[in-house]
Design a protein with these regions (language model features):
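Alpha-helical bundle regulatory/interaction domains
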Residues: 1-48, 57, 93-246, 253-260, ...
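DNA-recognition helix of C2H2 zinc fingers
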Residues: 301
Length: 345
C-alpha cells in the first residue's frame, strides 16, 4: 500500500497471532498504556491505525479489539504531550468510571480527553475515529480549558451531531484537501467543538459568571504565554500590564492552581519542548532553565522533579529513546510515522 507524506497506515494483522499484541502495545504506548484479555491476545487480536495530518491536527481511524486504556502521571511526565483528543465510534464503544456527563459513549456521541491529565477507559471491539488537536488550537476558545477531560458529549445536542458529521467528512476527504483548505477547516472545527464544550455545563449563576470572564481569561492566557520566560514576571507586574487588579488575576487563575503555579507550568511545558528537540549538541540544563524563566538550573530541576517525579535529564533520555523508536518504520518496515507526528504536533 503506497502512502503519502501525510498518511500513515499501521497494522499488525499481517503478523503471526503470537506477535500481534506485543507489536501493537509497543507502538501505541507512545500515548497510552494498553492491556487486553489473555484469550484475545492469544487467539483473536487485531489492530489497524490509519492516520492523516490535516493542518496541525492528526486524524486517526483505528480498528481493534477489547482493551483497557490508561494514561498515567508517569506517562504524561515521560512524553510531555498535552494535546486534546476527540473520539467518535463507528462501531463498538468506550466506558470510563471517570467520565463527566456520563460513563459510556452513546451512538453518535463524542468523548473528549485532555492528554495533560490522567485517563482510564475500556473499549469493546471497536472501530473509531480520533482527532488529536494541538492545545494552542483549542485552548483559548474554551471557557475552562482544563475542565473537560473524559467528558462525554451527548448526540442529543445538535452541535455534537454536527461536529460528529464533520469529523467523518474531514477524515473521508483528508487526502484530497489542500494546505490552505486545512487551515480554514481546522479553525472552523475548533470553533464548533468549543461551542459544544462551553455549553456542556448547563447554565448556573456560577458558569454564567465564568463565561462573562472568558475574554479576560483569553487575554490573561495570551499574556502569560508571551511573557512566562521573563525572570522578573510577578503577579503585580502581570496585573499592572494587563490592566486588571491583582485580586482579579488571582481569582481568575485560582482554578489553574494560582498565578505562580500557572507560570511554573507554562515554563515547564516550554522546557519539555526544548528537552525534546534533537540536536547534535544538546543544550545544557542551565541554558534551558534560563530560557524558560527559571532563576537557576537548581530551581528548574527541583520544579521539574516535584511536578513530574523525574529529572529533566531523565525526561530528555526518554524522549530520545521514543524518537529513535518512531523514526518512520520499525525493524520490519512497519509504518510508525503516526508516533512521530504525535510527538511533534
Amino acid at each position: 500500500m503506497t502512502q503519502s507524506s501525510t498518511n500513515s497506515f499501521f497494522t499488525v494483522n499481517d503478523l503471526p497471532m503470537s506477535k500481534r499484541y506485543d507489536v501493537w502495545q509497543s507502538s501505541i504506548d507512545c500515548i497510552f498504556n494498553v492491556e487486553t484479555l489473555p484469550d484475545i491476545r492469544k487467539n483473536t487480536f487485531h489492530a489497524t491505525l490509519d492516520a492523516d495530518l490535516l493542518g496541525s491536527m492528526m486524524l486517526a481511524r483505528t480498528n481493534s479489539t477489547h482493551q483497557f486504556w490508561e494514561r498515567s502521571s508517569h506517562t504524561i511526565a515521560a512524553d510531555g504531550m498535552d494535546h486534546y483528543i476527540l473520539q467518535l465510534y463507528y462501531s463498538g464503544g468506550v466506558t470510563s468510571d471517570y467520565g463527566k456527563d456520563g460513563q459510556e459513549i452513546a451512538p453518535d456521541g463524542l468523548l473528549f480527553q485532555d492528554l495533560s491529565q490522567t485517563t482510564k477507559a475500556t473499549t469493546s471491539d471497536f472501530d473509531n475515529l480520533v482527532f488529536v488537536i494541538p492545545r494552542p488550537l483549542l485552548e483559548d476558545r474554551l471557557t475552562l480549558p482544563e475542565d473537560h477531560n473524559m467528558r462525554f458529549l451527548s448526540p442529543r445536542d445538535p452541535m455534537v451531531r454536527v461536529v460528529a458529521n464533520l469529523m467523518r467528512s474531514l477524515k473521508a476527504n483528508a487526502s484530497a484537501l489542500k494546505t490552505e483548505h486545512a487551515h480554514v477547516l481546522e479553525n472552523s472545527f475548533a470553533d464548533m467543538l468549543a461551542a459544544c464544550l462551553n455549553s456542556a455545563y448547563g447554565e448556573t449563576s456560577d458558569t454564567t459568571n465564568k463565561r462573562q470572564n472568558i475574554e479576560v481569561m483569553t487575554m490573561i492566557r495570551r499574556y502569560f504565554r508571551e511573557n512566562f520566560s521573563r525572570p522578573d514576571l510577578t503577579p503585580e507586574r502581570a496585573a499592572r500590564e494587563l490592566g486588571i487588579s491583582r485580586s482579579k488575576l488571582y481569582q481568575l487563575l485560582e482554578e489553574h492552581g494560582g498565578v505562580y503555579r500557572y507560570t511554573r507550568d507554562l515554563r515547564l511545558r516550554r522546557a519539555k519542548q526544548l528537552l525534546s528537540t534533537t540536536t547534535k549538541r544538546p543544550r545544557s540544563l542551565y541554558d534551558v532553565a534560563l530560557e524558560c524563566g527559571f532563576s537557576s538550573d537548581t530551581s528548574f530541576i527541583r520544579a521539574f522533579r516535584e511536578t513530574f517525579d523525574m529529572t529533566p535529564g531523565d525526561f530528555r533520555r526518554n524522549q530520545q529513546t521514543a524518537l529513535k523508536n518512531s523514526n518512520g518504520a520499525d525493524g520490519e518496515g512497519r509504518d510508525t510515522r503516526y508516533e512521530k507526528w504525535l510527538h511533534s504536533l
